[in-house]
Amino acid sequence: MRKPSRLLVLALLAIGIFQVTHAKEENEVDASGEGPPGTSADSAPGSAPGSTTEETKTEDDANVDKSCKDRHDLCKFWSSIGECNTNQNWMEDHCPVSCDVCNGVSTCIDRHRLCGFWATIRECETNAVWMLSNCPKACKACKGRSVTLGGTGPGGTFQEDDCTFITTNEDTSIRKTLSIRDVRDSNANFNCAPTQETPNCNRNLCYHLRYRSFDGTCNNLEKPMIGSAFTALMRLKKPLYDNGLNAPTSSFLRSRPSARDASRLLLSSSTQIQHHSNALLMQWGQFIAHDLAKTTMLNNQECAACTSNKGRCTSVFLSRSDPTFGRFMCLPVARSTPVCGTGVTNFREQFNENTAFIDGSMIYGSSDRDQFLFRQGAFLKTKLINNRVFPPVDKNNNVVAGDDRANIFVGLASLHVLYLRQHNRIAATLQRVNPHWDQERVFHESRKIVGAMIQRITFTEYLPKVLGVVFEERIGAYPGYDPNTDPSVANEFTSCAFRFGHGMIQEFYPFLNEKFQHIGGIPFNDGMFKSTHILNNGIDPLIRGLMTLPAKMPQRLTPAVTERIFGNSDLGSINIQRGRDHGVPPYTVWRKFCGLPEVKDFEDLKSVISNQIVIDNLKVVYKHVDAIDMYVGSLLEDPVKDALVGPTLACIIGEQFKRTRNGDRLWYENSKVFTGEQLVQIKKITMSRVLCDAGEHFPIVPRKAFSVFKPTASNLVKCDEIPDLDYNAWKEELAV
């Protein structure tokens, strides 16, 4: 078959021989075994298929390509005179489009990069058969029904078999979706966060079956809101507010000590105990934390005045004897924004701005209305600085990403840069592999692959080091998608348990050159909200430094975050106060929840805290064991073997990630998400491979990027020794 040519078509039409020549070309193809058996060039088209019987099929017919396209120029005519019924076997093999047997079997795609152009110059009408076979999408001839017509299910609902074409656009025209600006406006004007409307998943079923919505809706097709952005955090246990509805714990009843006293006397320490993982593991944890959740905060300007406004502030009042902050009245802490309508006649609930899924929402954002702040066509927006590719930067020279916390620390900003480059690298590769794909298709396929990479690295490289020997017990192997599992982020996970990573922050981070030699570094506090370090030097020196710096065990917090963070604040106090703000039940409740030995008095703590001095200090600060804050008690536990955290944190973290995975219909291991060959490729990915792909210049890398190592030749490998993905697994066949 020929490819359409506008000039050829016009010339042939001008001399009146277009149809004759076109038929002649097709009959020449027939002579090679492609046409109806037993026909000659001058056979009447109506009789050609009709003369074919099952017995006369040639051996070539048995090897005919089974992809869904017509293989003869006269297929449409033969189908019009009933040959699909009277000569069914041959016609369905050679004329499947004309016989309408593709629906539910194949995907409707354009098979040439010029299909769109040819359609605009009316090739769909003047060269209909070739175009309908090879450019059905451009010719608007895809099998299946449009949204406006409805599907083939009861009441016009869509079914999976209706989705024989690939749609890359989620139609949100009939429902109001939220943007970050909507949330900010509601927060400023009404002191609460709005939730979004429940969508009709069936309207965009063909999109949802293949791609994630930006806001996470319709991941679960029966319960479309679970796990979605702009919804309330779920709870594992009922909250304990001082007034039963909304007042922070210990704000009226004074049942617990000052959060500052608990942080200063129990958590703050300059002593460091090293782990066999490295500081890049800590940074990955923060990256993932921002993928899963972002709690909206009320405006804190009023809190700076140290008012006792319980509605907006939960500031930590200070003692004059505090050695660091004694000159201040309080550490200002704004309350988390409540979901509109909660906290009056029901429990106050907090808001998650991000999707609960590991989907790269910190890269791409969590709103379809915000997506173009970060993307341009198939690619993420970039800025070239010092001949290096970065995200766009704001007026303060900080990188702009899908999550506005990207610049909290320069190490986190480095991972945002790394994955922006990785997305764009994948998009460019997919464009080369499938030049007929449009920009939307390339973007969504690239986003899908990046999300799968993050999932894979988190579950195979990150979590086993966090949970140690209890990883299999708490998370285990993937059992498949469970629509009855709620993947939503638990309030107790994001407000307490997963904040353990703050204890891994260190005082100083080195920079290393390509030979892993020290060339400087930065104190932690100097790396906060200052992307200029990587804009000037690139991300490689800092990432090499993170990989060679042993991870700090998280059971204590360095003075960099308890005495000097944010100028005059204490991250330990903020974490404790945040748990109280959210009404999180005390530590002893979570021991029981996790099926661990209960703690009824301070003596019972000896089974999980080996240091008697720590237990004695707990007794002095808290007076009663049932008053111990979840964050404090669980953080102070001795770590599980080979783990970073103790048994209570391992339980809560494992519980969350297990639900995150099992309740995600678009999890990379779900057999419907990637083809078998694509999944084989996804499973090759490692953090080391990503560094090779998207770093500025990593000629050598450690094979295990999250394990601490000495930079010797025996511990480093060349990038070409690290398995890479073969993107030909995503290649779609094109017409010849």
Language-model segments: residues:
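Short N-terminal segments immediately surrounding and downstream of signal-peptide cleavage
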Residues: E26-A41
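N-terminal accessory/cap region of cofactor-dependent oxidoreductases and related radical enzymes
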Residues: G33, K57-D60, I109-D110, S146-R425, ...
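Cleavable N-terminal signal peptides of Sec/SRP-targeted secreted and luminal proteins
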Residues: P4-A23
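Short amphipathic alpha-helical molecular recognition features
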Residues: R2, S67, E83-N87, T107, ...
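Mobile, glycine-rich extracellular loop/lid and propeptide segments
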Residues: V442
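Compact disulfide-stabilized, cysteine-rich extracellular microdomains and processed peptide cores
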Residues: K24-E25, G33, T53-E54, T58-G151
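Intrinsically disordered, low-complexity proline-rich tandem-repeat tracts
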Residues: P37, A44-P45, P49
